[in-house]
Amino acid sequence: MSGFSTEERAAPFSLEYRVFLKNEKGQYISPFHDIPIYADKDVFHMVVEVPRWSNAKMEIATKDPLNPIKQDVKKGKLRYVANLFPYKGYIWNYGAIPQTWEDPGHNDKHTGCCGDNDPIDVCEIGSKVCARGEIIGVKVLGILAMIDEGETDWKVIAINVDDPDAANYNDINDVKRLKPGYLEATVDWFRRYKVPDGKPENEFAFNAEFKDKDFAIDIIKSTHDHWKALVTKKTNGKGISCMNTTLSESPFKCDPDAARAIVDALPPPCESACTVPTDVDKWFHHQKN
């Protein structure tokens, strides 16, 4: 969407790498807290964390000031998702809806599990491969209820409103009709993507059935309410940084100079990326259960 831009710090695929978001005035903002949930009527903003076909597990750093995008780290090593045959990296543009939060203190009535302490995830199914940190408007189509190591981890299915075919997609059944096999592949991907790392398969509520647009929007609105409680200090943040530059009702609001100081303290941008390990291109063959 127009008005937002990104600024990288340090080298991509390094432990220090960060992507910060800026508004139309060039001021640093939090992609978690300062970008409005809605881009337009019935259109949600999406923060793209991982472009389709890529492997680096980038995510909004919920516990860092200003919540830049960074690569996830496990046991001191940068995380890359495996290529689980027949897939290459992520099979959609993957990211999050801003101003949402899956509250780890809230037991979801649909799943019986508490939230995963992150913004709600989005799988964008359009034709364009988006850029890391890009802010797009999406039309919500449905939702999948994944259970990840005992936590609720909703996956919203959506399409970029600027996609040439966006007008043809209005609910989850349109995805089934126009992209046969895509939803089945989505379940398969989420079920098995951690197996190459030695983890068990993920589970799903509703027997891995996708719920429709109206159900999805209700879930998103619920996570938005949880986020409101978070940034107004009405609930325990569980270590999350709520620093923001736009929310007048939030005690965590800071001025632009304080936000700039956060960024200026980090390594400068680097023109060249670090080398990605060659085994990231490996294909994993795993028997489906």
UniProtKB/Swiss-Prot annotation:
Pfam families: Pyrophosphatase. The modification Phosphoserine is found at residue 250. GO terms for biological process: phosphate-containing compound metabolic process. It comes from the Eukaryota. Gene3D superfamilies: Inorganic pyrophosphatase. The modification N-acetylserine is found at residue 2. Its cofactor is Mg(2+). The modification N6-acetyllysine is found at residues 57, 228. It is an enzyme of class 3 (hydrolase). One of its GO terms (molecular function) is magnesium ion binding. SUPFAM superfamilies: Inorganic pyrophosphatase (SSF50324). It is found in: Cytoplasm. InterPro entries: Pyrophosphatase (IPR008162), Pyrophosphatase_sf (IPR036649). Mg(2+) 1 binds at residues 116, 121, 153. Expressed ubiquitously. Mg(2+) 2 binds at residue 121. GO terms for cellular component: cytoplasm; cytosol; extracellular exosome. Its EC number is 3.6.1.1. Keywords: Acetylation, Cytoplasm, Hydrolase, Magnesium, Metal-binding, Phosphoprotein. It catalyses: diphosphate + H2O = 2 phosphate + H(+). Belongs to the PPase family. Homodimer. This is Inorganic pyrophosphatase. It comes from Homo sapiens. The gene is PPA1.
